[in-house]
């Protein structure tokens, strides 16, 4: 049995949360596994060497069908398109207008916006993670291989996201930028452990899910910004969400090709990542004070409906439909069919679990937590 096809239910120890309510909400958002990766049985280089030929055979396809999803730099938006023009005589007035709009946003909104920005700023970790994947990594740092070109150019496009949000935070005057910057530095130094095992089958399942999750989160921060009267910030977050959707399309296409060429291996890889649960990129986030910072951020995101357990289930359901897993038959082993059935039934089970968690959370006493990002002001979690 090939290692890539082994479906493992990896053990995950629960994180001790500050309250019963927090524990339940975090469980609903599936963060217990995310902050407990130290207990995951580590596996490396799980793709059999012969599987690398699958990715070599896809290089022509990647060049013609994947790379066109990247935009030429001259056609891309840049952070300065949305921010006050520092060369303009109206700069101070534009900053004043930005700060006036920001004043109408509640503290809890800034918690999720800062959390999203910090997640984007850890981009060096994500490029590093993709370059751990066997068969698709950038072997020289400037390789012309289409997989390497994709990774570098994807990184360049993503780099604008944290950049624009960070500059907005700085100009808004609403957040403690030193604590935000410390959190970014801690997060990049901590890295991430998504459980992808240097295996591009697992890696591209992960990125397909994660890009959609990020698009959902940015789309919802756009919705909330508009509801609070900041149309410029709403356009900013919406533009970032559009980038994420385009990137999600690309990664989803890769998995489609894997299902075409190696349906059993791809199906087992999808089930493997679903068993492990998708680890959020910033799951090791902390600010030097709050070691449960990611759980607290995730709880606020859940409460504001920015990213919830229901969103997780919706993404699973979307990918099942996109990849046509319910009708996948040809090329599947018995284990592959069991993996397919598990994945296809997962969203419904997760929604039931989320409903139970939400009902229990409503009965718990509300609790406030201080966030260093907003000068230790308290927010309900």
UniProtKB/Swiss-Prot annotation:
Protein family: Belongs to the fatty acid desaturase type 2 family.
Cofactor binding, note field: Binds 2 Fe(2+) ions per subunit.
Extent of the transit peptide: 1-26
Annotated localization: Plastid, Chloroplast
Pfam families with a match to the protein in the record: FA_desaturase_2
Listed EC numbers: 1.14.19.2
Top-level lineage group: Eukaryota
Keywords, alphabetical: Chloroplast, Fatty acid biosynthesis, Fatty acid metabolism, Iron, Lipid biosynthesis, Lipid metabolism, Metal-binding, Oxidoreductase, Plastid, Transit peptide
PANTHER family reported for this sequence: ACYL- ACYL-CARRIER-PROTEIN DESATURASE-RELATED (PTHR31155), STEAROYL-[ACYL-CARRIER-PROTEIN] 9-DESATURASE 6, CHLOROPLASTIC (PTHR31155:SF31)
A single cellular component GO annotation: chloroplast
Name this protein carries in UniProt: Stearoyl-[acyl-carrier-protein] 9-desaturase 1, chloroplastic
Names of required cofactors: Fe(2+)
Binding positions (Fe cation 2): 158, 211, 244, 247
List of residues binding Fe cation 1: 120, 158, 161, 244
Gene Ontology MF term list: metal ion binding; stearoyl-[ACP] desaturase activity
Annotated pathway: Lipid metabolism; fatty acid metabolism
Protein purpose: Converts stearoyl-ACP to oleoyl-ACP by introduction of a cis double bond between carbons 9 and 10 of the acyl chain.
InterPro entries: Fatty_acid_desaturase-2 (IPR005067), Ferritin-like_SF (IPR009078), RNR-like (IPR012348)
Main subcellular location of this protein, as a coarse class: plastid
Subunit structure, interactors included: Homodimer.
């Amino acid at each position: 049995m090939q290692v890539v096809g082994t479906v493992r239910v990896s053990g995950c120890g629960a994180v001790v949360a500050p309250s019963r309510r927090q524990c339940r909400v975090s469980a609903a958002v599936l963060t217990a596994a995310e902050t407990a990766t130290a207990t995951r049985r580590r596996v490396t280089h799980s793709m059999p060497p012969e599987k690398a030929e699958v990715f070599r055979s896809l290089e022509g396809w990647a060049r013609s069908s994947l790379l066109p999803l990247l935009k030429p730099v001259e056609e891309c938006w840049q952070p300065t398109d949305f921010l006050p023009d520092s060369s303009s005589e109206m700069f101070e007035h534009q900053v004043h207008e930005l700060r006036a709009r920001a004043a109408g946003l509640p503290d809890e909104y800034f918690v999720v916006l800062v959390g999203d920005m910090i997640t984007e700023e850890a981009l060096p970790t994500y490029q590093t993670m993709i370059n751990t994947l066997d068969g698709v990594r950038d072997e020289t740092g400037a390789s012309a291989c289409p997989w390497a070109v994709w990774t570098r150019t994807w990184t360049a496009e993503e780099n604008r996201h944290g950049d624009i949000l960070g500059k907005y935070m700085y100009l808004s005057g609403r957040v403690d930028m030193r604590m935000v910057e410390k959190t970014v530095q801690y997060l990049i130094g901590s890295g991430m452990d998504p459980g992808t095992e240097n295996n591009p089958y697992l890696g591209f399942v992960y990125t397909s899910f994660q890009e959609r999750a990020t698009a959902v989160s940015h789309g919802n921060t756009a919705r909330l910004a508009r509801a609070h009267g900041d149309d410029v910030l709403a356009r900013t977050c919406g533009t970032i969400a559009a980038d994420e959707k385009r990137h999600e399309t690309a990664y989803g296409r890769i998995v489609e090709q894997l299902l075409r060429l190696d349906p059993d291996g791809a199906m087992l890889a999808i089930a493997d990542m679903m068993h492990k649960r998708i680890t959020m990129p910033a799951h090791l986030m902390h600010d030097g004070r709050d070691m449960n910072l990611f759980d607290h951020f995730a709880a606020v995101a859940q409460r504001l409906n920015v990213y919830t357990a229901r969103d997780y289930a919706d993404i699973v359901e979307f990918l099942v439909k996109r990849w046509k897993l319910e009708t996948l038959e040809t090329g599947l082993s018995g284990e592959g069919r069991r993996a397919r059935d598990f994945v296809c039934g997962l969203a419904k089970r997760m929604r039931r679990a989320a409903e139970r968690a939400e009902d229990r959370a409503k009965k718990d006493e509300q609790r406030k937590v201080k966030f260093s990002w907003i000068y230790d002001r308290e927010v309900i979690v």
